Structure formats: structure tokens, C-alpha cells
Amino acid sequence: MEYSHKSVLLKETIEYLNIKPEGIYVDGTLGGGGHSEEILKRLTTGKLIAIDRDLDAIKASKERLKNYKNAEYINDNFKNIKEILKSLNIDKVDGILLDLGVSSYQLEEVKRGFSYMKDAPMDMRMDKNSPFSAYDVVNKYSQQELERVIREYGEEKWASRIAKFIVKEREKGEIKTTFQLVEIIKNAVPASARREGPHPAKRTFQAIRIEVNEELKGLDKAIEDMVEVLRGKGRIAIITFHSLEDRIVKNTFKKLENPCTCPPNMPCTCGKKPVVKIITKKPVLPSKEEIETNSRSRSAKLRVAEKL
């Protein structure tokens, strides 16, 4: 399919990365290639490592960026950054970008099952080679497990009712499509709650997607690994789309900026030194204009840290 993809906070992210024409940069979430293209435009002798776990994204972006010869495409998870760079004989890089969550091209590809607005098989896998999909979560998890996932990853106040309704419904037969699930959620969420706020299925779909793709698992460790492979003055820029991700990024940056574990009123004896300086004291948010032209950007937050 043709991937139309509007990169979120594009101008701001590129500015914060402080791109050097001869530098080595990593786009850990290639997606539709929007951020990668802007990085490549600014490189002369430099190089871009473009990573995505979704092979379709790699293929589409390779085509989009075919005029640039200084890009290396890697079909892998950005969490394996150390192994990826080692395999390329690269020791340090000058900047890293992550644009977390599901991308617009994945939402647009109906059969992937990411969207609650289009009927599709229960899938939601970012890596199509993974044997584990949304179908397994919805049809095989116990009521308690479903409630935990929906509450924890969707921050859904009706998690208990939704889990109960899913289990009750699947007694009649398998839940195979997204619209089947949407209907169950609508029945579970009281009418008064459905009348206001976002689509009633939004949080549950987010929760199942995070569970299927293990999006939050090891994110803090991945950020630490990325900071480790940054050169001094190199920057890491991370765009998040919900509070769970943002909290992990914020807290990991804070820990790296102030790793001291000594009691606050005592002189430091632990020997742990700051590793980064946080560049964005508050997250950078999209402009009103960007939200109007790209609704996906509404919940985006950008945080940036610089290696000391």
C-alpha cells in the first residue's frame, strides 16, 4: 500500500537533534520515514541507521528514501540498539530519535487491526513474524489478566466491566474482529460515560496493542543503552503519545541526570555521576496549527536529553 505519513513534531525534533553533516544518527522507529528524510537531508559524509521492527515500514521507507545513499536499514527492535551497532562496527553515534507508539501508516493499513474505526482481524502486531497477536489476548487471557492489561496499559476506569463482558461474550464463540470487540466495549461502558470523552474503545485498544508488542517492557533499559552509545554532546529525542510512555522517558532521563542514591541531606559518597543533561525541562508540545493539520499529534510530547 501507499504509506501516507505525517511525522509529528518534525521541525522541533530535527532542531533539537543539532544534526552535524558528518555525524552518525539513529532513527529507532523509521515508520513512514518522515523524520529519517529530514535527517538525511542534513547529512553530507554522515550516516543514518534506520530501524523498524515492521518489515513493511522498511520496504516503504526504502522506496521513499531511495535517492539517499548514506542510510542503513535494519529490521529489528530499537531495544537491541547495542547489538545492532555492534553488528555494523559502530561504537558511538551523534544522535538518536524515537517516535513511539503505533504509526499512522499502520493505522491506515486496515488488515493490521490497530484501529477501532475500521473492521479487521484481531491482530495489532508491529512485527508480523511474531506468533502472538491481539487475538490471543482477547480470546485466551483470563478475566483477571484482561482486567490488569486494560487497567494498567489503558488506564481505563471501566477495565473490570470490559474484561467481564469480553469473557462472557467469548463463551458464545471466538472474538475474531475489531468491530466485535468494539461492540463488546460499547456494551460494557455505561451510556453516560460513552457520551463524553474519547471513543469508548480507545483505551482498551491501546492497552491490548501495548501488551501484544511489549511496548513498555524494557523501555527504560533501552533508553539507558541508547545514552550509553551516544557520543559526548550527542542528543536523544523521544516522542511519546500517552502518559505511561512519557512517565518512563521522564523518569529515566531524571535518573540519568541525577543518579546519586545518597540521602538528600548528606554529601554524595555513592560516586554516581550525571550522564545526561535534560534539554527540555518541560515536554515540547505540538503547535495549534500542527494539531489542526494532523490530529495524531494531539497527545504527542517530545523530551530531549544530551550526553555529558
Swiss-Prot record:
Belongs to the methyltransferase superfamily. RsmH family. S-adenosyl-L-methionine binds at G33, G34, H35, D52, F78, D99, Q106. It is an enzyme of class 2 (transferase). One of its GO terms (biological process) is rRNA base methylation. It comes from the Bacteria. It is found in: Cytoplasm. Specifically methylates the N4 position of cytidine in position 1402 (C1402) of 16S rRNA. GO terms for molecular function: rRNA (cytosine-N4-)-methyltransferase activity. The gene is rsmH. It comes from Thermoanaerobacter pseudethanolicus (strain ATCC 33223 / 39E). This is Ribosomal RNA small subunit methyltransferase H. Keywords: Cytoplasm, Methyltransferase, rRNA processing, S-adenosyl-L-methionine, Transferase. Residues 289-308 are annotated as: Disordered. It catalyses: cytidine(1402) in 16S rRNA + S-adenosyl-L-methionine = N(4)-methylcytidine(1402) in 16S rRNA + S-adenosyl-L-homocysteine + H(+). The keyword Cytoplasm applies. InterPro entries: RsmH, SAM-dep_MeTrfase_MraW_recog, SAM-dependent_MTases_sf. Its EC number is 2.1.1.199. GO terms for cellular component: cytoplasm.
